[in-house]
């Protein structure tokens, strides 16, 4: 299971990078409109913050302190910086998973998750679904608000 999670998170982060790179401009990354309050840039920051918190700080002991509200308020971060942060998140996830023994997945996650004591496997699997949900939103955002007709093949 650990190898599967590692591979799926690596693929997801690579797809996130491809999506960010597929935006025609930095301004397009931060575009919102109508009933779409979150830009792709903010969703990317949210995913990065999520991984840094749940993998880096909680499993890896990195000391990362999450500011979730800021993930949705920050704006106009450069495309280059987002890509750098995506690559850093890849390392954070890889390092955190590397610290886990396969048996650790069955143990209770170090902090409560959604006000419950659940296994580490449950949390990491849940977070993968959360990641993919927002990745799909980013793809849809790019095509809807920016006018791209095709998927980024991410």
What are these regions (language model features)?
Residues 15, 92-95, 133, 140:
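Residues on one face of amphipathic alpha-helical coiled coils
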Residues 74-110, 119-131:
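Acidic/histidine-rich alpha-helical segments that form the ligand environment
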Residues 11, 15, 46, 85-88, ...:
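Charged, amphipathic alpha-helical oligomerization/scaffolding segments
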Residues 22-29, 97-106, 143-148:
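Surface-exposed helix-capping loop/turn segments at secondary-structure junctions
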Residues 6-10, 27-70, 111-154:
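Short, contiguous alpha-helical
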Residues 2-15, 19, 23:
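N-terminal leader/capping segments at the start of a protein or of a new domain
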